[in-house]
Amino acid sequence: MADGGIDRKADEKIQFSTSKEVTVHPTFESMSLKESLLRGIYAYGYESPSAVQSRAIVQICKGRDTIAQAQSGTGKTATFSISMLQVIDTAVRETQALVLSPTRELATQIQSVVMALGDYMNVQCHACIGGTNVGEDIRKLDYGQHIVSGTPGRVADMIRRRHLRTRHIKMLVLDEADELLNQGFREQIYDVYRYLPPATQVVVVSATLPYDVLDMTTKFMTDPVRILVKRDELTLEGLKQYFIAVEKEDWKFDTLCDLYDTLTITQAVIFCNTRRKVDWLTDKMREANFTVSSMHGDMPQKERDSIMQDFRQGNSRVLISTDVWARGIDVQQVSLVINYDLPSNRENYIHRIGRSGRFGRKGVAINFVTSEDVRILRDIELYYSTQIDEMPMNVADLIS
């Protein structure tokens, strides 16, 4: 995987709307990183920093509060992982950096990136997530973890129970901040933040930063440095977006069955808006003798993990999911995303289709649109300054 899988051509075109004091560091060597961390970076497959890495890593390592906005597949996770690994002292077995993510899968993925990049540093990093054994969390945290990557509920719980000690924490990272700061997690984040030392550095990372999120960050960030991608750059380049007009909801299923052979050319993800719809569609597809797997937030964590693993390894080729999957989950082979339901929140559109064609691979997104959905589709087009065309007959050629 050359260059950690980042698409250089698309990366060079990203236009940053960034604080004036931010300098660009064209190589990892020029960032004054620890030798053991550099070894981990190169072993991971990175050769040179992506656009967001070349700007954000040094600012974060300097201790600046940072808002970094970059689209999926530009190396966002490695940006803050490298920064955390640079600032922690592995000789002190206490939690020094904390990452909060909106989903358990994302929290686990961040932990594995940290462990891989920190391979030569003897780093301890634990994924502290709901749906798993509390006893295991307590054992790991009592042993001492340099970095904790978790979901807000479980992290807040472990802090309250005094197993996650906060006095040495110097950095808090909010990943997929737009989702985290939506109503669901806002209270829990404030809860966690209250326990952190007053001088804790805050790093906010997300593909989309609506104004209300930026507004809220002022509450716990001091003079943040901003590294922002312009709004109209946000639809991933090289990604073909189509819609299929289905007169009514009932016709979506037949349309999906007609497309099934196309789906299995590579791997595909199908998004529905509710957990119930995911279960319904999965059952209906299986009744019609189609092989599909499915995942949503109601499932036990173990089951979600094994479904993810099967999908990552390519054992299952079509995954039906809710937006729990849409945020930051990196599966290389996905080159087709189907929005069986258009997302109810337009910010989620980019997170969903950002799965397909990650890292510059060709990707196709297909939206099923009933007459009631036309307005939502137009709204998405306007919001992202993009054009979504009617799907051509030869869609299979575009994917293969």
UniProtKB/Swiss-Prot annotation:
Domain of life the protein comes from: Eukaryota
Keyword Zinc attached: no
Any Gene Ontology biological process: rRNA processing
Record-linked PROSITE patterns: DEAD_ATP_HELICASE, HELICASE_ATP_BIND_1, HELICASE_CTER, Q_MOTIF
Reaction catalyzed: ATP + H2O = ADP + phosphate + H(+)
Keyword Transport: no
The Helicase ATP-binding domain, residue ranges: 57-227
Pfam families per the UniProt record, alphabetical: DEAD (PF00270), Helicase_C (PF00271)
GO cellular component terms, semicolon-separated: catalytic step 2 spliceosome; nucleolar chromatin; nucleolus
Chief subcellular location: nucleus
Keywords: ATP-binding, Helicase, Hydrolase, Nucleotide-binding, Nucleus, Ribosome biogenesis, RNA-binding, rRNA processing
E.C. designation(s): 3.6.4.13
Binding site for ATP: 70-77
Motif extent (DEAD box): 175-178
Motif (Q motif): 26-54
Signal sequence range: none
Domain notes: The Q motif is unique to and characteristic of the DEAD box family of RNA helicases and controls ATP binding and hydrolysis.
Function per UniProt: ATP-dependent RNA helicase involved in 40S ribosomal subunit biogenesis. Required for the processing and cleavage of 35S pre-rRNA at sites A0, A1, and A2, leading to mature 18S rRNA.
Protein name, as recorded: ATP-dependent RNA helicase fal-1
